[in-house]
Swiss-Prot record:
It comes from Leuconostoc mesenteroides subsp. mesenteroides (strain ATCC 8293 / DSM 20343 / BCRC 11652 / CCM 1803 / JCM 6124 / NCDO 523 / NBRC 100496 / NCIMB 8023 / NCTC 12954 / NRRL B-1118 / 37Y). The active site is at residue 45. It is an enzyme of class 2 (transferase). GO terms for cellular component: cytoplasm. Belongs to the NAD kinase family. It comes from the Bacteria. It is found in: Cytoplasm. It catalyses: NAD(+) + ATP = ADP + NADP(+) + H(+). This is NAD kinase. InterPro entries: ATP-NAD_kinase_N (IPR017438), ATP-NAD_kinase_PpnK-typ_C (IPR017437), NAD/diacylglycerol_kinase_sf (IPR016064), NADK (IPR002504). Pfam families: NAD_kinase, NAD_kinase_C. Its EC number is 2.7.1.23. HAMAP family: NAD_kinase.
Amino acid sequence: MKIAIFNNHAEHSVIIAKKLILAMKKNNVDIDDRNPDIVVSVGGDGTLLGAFQKYVDQTESVRFVGLHTGHLGFYTDWLSTELDQFVDSLIHDNGQKVSYPLLELTVVRTSGESYKFLALNEAVIKQPIGTLVADIYLGGQAFERFRGDGIAVATPTGSTAYNKANGGAVLHPSLPAIQMSEIASINNRVFRTLGSPLIVPQDQEIVMKPKSNHFLVMYDQEEIKGHNITELRFKVSEKRVHFAQYRHVDFWRRVQNAFISEIE
């Protein structure tokens, strides 16, 4: 088994990553940053997003696992205080995993060229200055002309992030779907949008045709300048992300811990 360790630059994360490397070497586990079987993310959910994007081309063959150096996150099952227990689970790994849906984003340029990207969390299209105007198509048909600050499209696991702040629903990751939410849409007697989040199944895609070239496309922690882009397509990817599952942490428990806390 080959392990890659991806950590943020916070002092505590660096210390934990060094301890983990020493533990792996002590147990004769190979450290391989190029072709790992398991990628260990040391940090928070943002760090795991960075790890996913680094190894996105190996999505089908690697498993991720998060070691959190703060509070328990949505993508991290282990706390840094549980390092010894985590190491024991890692060295006795037998391939156990759980998989979740990914978002496939296709960017079409004016030249006709298209580029595909994968997102674990979400993709956000925003207009830095002024109003974003874009035609939205669903099921191959024109649905609405959006006017506002932007659009967010999230995976089920990403539904607890920006999507939730936009008033979107929290989706269980067992559902193969994506969700579109509006960011500060303009609704009056002249301009109208649906004004509510949309949940789209895996056999359909969302198509967005912006009316300007001055917008930003962000997916996870990556960014694409919105120059010479004529179309953006969003759908559930045929690929899935795989996490090493050494213990079960219920999704709704994660949601409760993050937003509600314990019920008395």
